[in-house]
Amino acid sequence: MSAGSTPKPSPLVEGIFRREILPWGLLGLTLGLVEGATAAILVKQHFAGAASSFGVNIAVALVSGAPAFSNVLSFVWANVAHGRARVQLMVALQAAFALLVGCVALASRASAGLAVTVLSIIAARVVWAGILTVRAAVWTANYPRHVLARITGRIVIVNAIAVATSAALVGGALQGRVIDARWLYGGGAIAGLSGAWLYRAMRVRREFQLLAAEAAHGGKSEPFSLRMLTQILKEDPAYREYMLWMGVFGAGNLMLTAQLVLLFSEQLHLTSGVQIGLLAVVPLLTQPLFMPAWSRLFDGSHVVRYRSRQGWALVLASLTLCLGVFTRSLTLLWLGAVLLGAAQAGANLGWNLGHNDFASLGRAQHYMGVHVTLTGLRGGVAPPLGVLAYMGLERWHAGSGEWALLLPLAMTVAGALGFNRMRVALER
């Protein structure tokens, strides 16, 4: 290999990748039905008039934040997975996830059906949080660090395309009203169960070493818990600061999505198809175009340096979307959707893999547990606060709710500045 050339994955690594690409693609079809923006638009459009406006808006906030909020119980999943064979556990979680998504198809169009829908989506996302926690350890074991982002980036690309496909189908069903959009959730359950069945062929490299390393760090005698979470943050000041700025940065992003769903529906009066196109389909389809560039940047630097660059991409996307709302410009909104996809491609990569630059062997799952648990806390708080800020301004003066967008924009800027502060300290 010549100096400066990019190392290629070994045939063994490529073989492992081929085994898991199709299962994750099928599960992506299921996941797309409970992604934050898609689920929020479904709730807003399908249950409008079937429940109180306040109840529907709070439900929008809950399902919008569900992908993040559900992670608050990740320490339980880290404890369940610690010291256990990963593939069998993963298959069980994937099957449970698919069945919970299918429950949405059974919900009636009434207040009770709204409750069933919200609870099913949150429960499905709780199980998906377990899948992400276990998958982090599998990927770390199977793929060397110098190719980790490129290999997993391919999986994320396939997953994003599948999620976008599901989102587009929901948007078409809501707008065309040819079929009930909830029927798609039954099909999503079948796709997810098929993915779980295929994942049984997956293997974990040197799993005995992984289990031994976990046992050396306490094994079942020291399960992951809130006490361990606080201990890790106390003992690792660099990771603690990284989590602080991730919290500010991520909360702004989560708050923005919930507010945009309400603004698009209540003030801009966009159709369901356009809303899902702006908040789900276009960002998801844009991600694969930018993933290779973000992957190369991640593989060649520490996550702090990476975030100090990637953070500004999300700031630019958020600013463009806000300007699109303020000026009622569809052109700016579509541009913002493209920029959002570009930024999310990098954000997803850093979210899934960034903790590895702080954790030692055998502790990656615990560090990921800290990360996703804190993600859950902001997911449960930020979207409802954003929605309440919007409704409060609307109650004070009709039409002024759009100014609530300044809150998530300011938080995203603050987070990006925090990552740059860490980068400067790291390079001293």
Predicted region positions:
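Helix-loop boundary and gating motifs at the non-cytosolic
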Residues: 2-72, 238-280
